[in-house]
Amino acid sequence: VKIVVERDPIKTSFEKWAKPGHFSRTLAKGPNTTTWIWNLHADAHDFDSHTNDLEEISRKVFSAHFGQLAIILIWLSGMYFHGARFSNYEAWLSDPTRIKPSAQVVWPIVGQEILNGDVGGGFRGIQITSGFFQIWRASGITSELQLYCTAIGALIFAALMLFAGWFHYHKAAPKLAWFQDVESMLNHHLAGLLGLGSLSWAGHQVHVSLPINQLLDAGVDPKEIPLPHEFISNRDLVAQLYPSFAKGLTPFFALNWSEYSEFLTFRGGLNPVTGGLWLTDTAHHHLAIAILFLIAGHMYRTNWGIGHSLKEILEAHKGPFTGEGHKGIYEILTTSWHAQLALNLAMLGSLTIVVAHHMYSMPPYPYLAIDYGTQLSLFTHHMWIRGFLIVGAAAHAAIFMVRDYDPTIQYNNLLDRVLRHRDAIVSHLNWACIFLGFHSFGLYIHNDTMSALGRPQDMFSDTAIQLQPIFAQWIQNTHASAPSSTAPGAAASTSLTWGGGDLLAVGGKVALLPIPLGTADFLVHHIHAFTIHVTVLILLKGVLFARSSRLIPDKANLGFRFPCDGPGRGGTCQVSAWDHVFLGLFWMYNAISVVIFHFSWKMQSDVWGSISDRGVVTHITGGNFAQSSITINGWLRDFLWAQASQVIQSYGSSLSAYGLFFLGAHFVWAFSLMFLFSGRGYWQELIESIVWAHNKLKVAPAIQPRALSIVQGRAVGVAHY
């Protein structure tokens, strides 16, 4: 591998910035109509449309990534700065069960200071639900000064990233061959980012986080705990907490690794003081991950003729019934960044769902489990992110099909074979959606009807006709019994939610307990299956028919987004790949809503609550999920209305901001319908009347007003929706 760069390829100049639309011949001429500003935004980052040169496109994307990292670091710096300057972090650290986290104080302008509630410890501010305090505690931050230093450090890193983005586009821009060298990239990303990244975090946890958290858990005042660098430079300090530290690296080289089991543990379960995972378990986990990825980062063939070649692996990958197998896929992934991105988004989206579920079932940070608002926010956040990632995967897969797919190279490989039997795939998926839709909804309708007729004995419920999720219960059971059977080394199962164990309470609140699954969960899980399958149907159909269909055989020539196939072809509107993404987004929202409703209600009903001195648990909604959520009426009455009414009645209290957001969000949603339920022609006619009036008064603008195009109107609508 030779690192090939081109020196000074493009001179640095701000002249182009002064010329809006410099990237397109038509846009650079300036505006004739108001459509110009929309096209400017739509195409500014569509590098494919600026040039066909893959090397130039790759350099722009690469450079933009540094800019993205800079923005992320600036944002993070702001979070840490708020923690340093406007928060009650030190107070929270000394009493995390009674004091609520706050890092924002509203200034007294037009009475807004009503939003500053009493969060405890003599601090008035807005309670935050981002989980930052819990992360800071887990990483061993004990003072606001440390947060301040970290914030400054992040800004310095952001500046470095901005410099790197400029440098690698203007001063030393990589050649195309460098972007296409997948083996070298895999080695560096696996060993460097994931391997050394995990190793350095594990090192930080062992040397800084663990001793500090050990002392905090024991009730030592944060101000008396030695500073982080003292633990690193003075081994005796750590050795007082973990005696094996005194032996240094001898046990490591002597292969007596069990000596280190004081701070690299395999306990399972949660720390009873904090309600979070044992940080000694997570340190061990990151060390193990680091080893795996450091090995993985040495598996691919570069300068020395050993290791895997990705092209060889893909081309050897064929079964008896799969034609040419993965032949041609290597060429796709090295010449189409859309294809590459689609795969990565799909996998990252799936991973994000896993993260969402682990945040509550295995709370990774101290005191996260008893901060219910934060738990709910983190779940919601990761679910939304996952939705955008998965829809984005379909969008870029479709763009790949339209712009980058070359049917002459892809013959009888797996991609070609999937495309050739797409009718079978889509019609089967359609059948699955119909089946799931009628059956899942039908179970609810049956229950609503029986409930209305006063026949509870004929309902599907845990107390009448049971539909127990036996497979899910079996999975729960195998995991709950693992410590005594398949995982003899672990002291407890991976999560309290599996069952078997007792509940864990921290500060009089339930941190976690075994989550029972019953008929109500069985019903709502089939709604999940339904909404997810419909989302997949819409998105996959968009990808499989992006280039051609029986209706429009030459769809590839029309591009990724087009409103209709021209005059004289009725019934061809809303058929572009873009429109499938547009429709898929609505079902993604649908799916997420049901997921978040299910999670919110289930946790409040069966998990979250307070515990008395006698050990009696009182759940927030009193365990009403199992009997109430089995009818549509129950969802409307006992969840949506019961919970919304609290928000609606919040005006005039410190919670009023949430009531206003609630109102405002519904307002924005209703506003979206104006774009979605109206025709373009209506607005064009209206605009022309208004322009006529302006002409009469001789105040007509030079730039002609035009209604949004059909696609633009839909984009604005779906964004507000």
Swiss-Prot record:
Keywords: 4Fe-4S, Chlorophyll, Chloroplast, Chromophore, Electron transport, Iron, Iron-sulfur, Magnesium, Membrane, Metal-binding, Oxidoreductase, Photosynthesis, Photosystem I, Plastid, Thylakoid, Transmembrane, Transmembrane helix, Transport
Cross-referenced SUPFAM superfamilies: Photosystem I subunits PsaA/PsaB
Record-listed chlorophyll a' binding positions: 666
Cofactor note: P700 is a chlorophyll a/chlorophyll a' dimer, A0 is one or more chlorophyll a, A1 is one or both phylloquinones and FX is a shared 4Fe-4S iron-sulfur center.
Any GO BP annotation: photosynthesis
Binding-site residues for phylloquinone, renumbered to this chain: 683
Sites where the protein binds chlorophyll a: 674, 682
Disulfide bonds: none
Keyword Metal-binding: yes
Catalytic activity annotation: reduced [plastocyanin] + hnu + oxidized [2Fe-2S]-[ferredoxin] = oxidized [plastocyanin] + reduced [2Fe-2S]-[ferredoxin]
Membrane topology: Multi-pass membrane protein
Annotated transmembrane regions: 61-84, 147-170, 186-210, 282-300, 337-360, 376-402, 424-446, 522-540, 580-601, 655-677, 715-721
GO CC terms in record: chloroplast thylakoid membrane; photosystem I
UniProt-recorded Gene Ontology molecular function terms: 4 iron, 4 sulfur cluster binding; chlorophyll binding; metal ion binding; oxidoreductase activity
Record localization: Plastid, Chloroplast thylakoid membrane
EC numbers on record: 1.97.1.12
Keyword Iron: yes
Family stated for the protein in its record: Belongs to the PsaA/PsaB family.
Biological role stated in the UniProt entry: PsaA and PsaB bind P700, the primary electron donor of photosystem I (PSI), as well as the electron acceptors A0, A1 and FX. PSI is a plastocyanin-ferredoxin oxidoreductase, converting photonic excitation into a charge separation, which transfers an electron from the donor P700 chlorophyll pair to the spectroscopically characterized acceptors A0, A1, FX, FA and FB in turn. Oxidized P700 is reduced on the lumenal side of the thylakoid membrane by plastocyanin.
Subunit structure: The PsaA/B heterodimer binds the P700 chlorophyll special pair and subsequent electron acceptors. PSI consists of a core antenna complex that captures photons, and an electron transfer chain that converts photonic excitation into a charge separation. The eukaryotic PSI reaction center is composed of at least 11 subunits.
Protein known as: Photosystem I P700 chlorophyll a apoprotein A1
Protein's organism: Ginkgo biloba (Ginkgo)
UniProt gene name: psaA
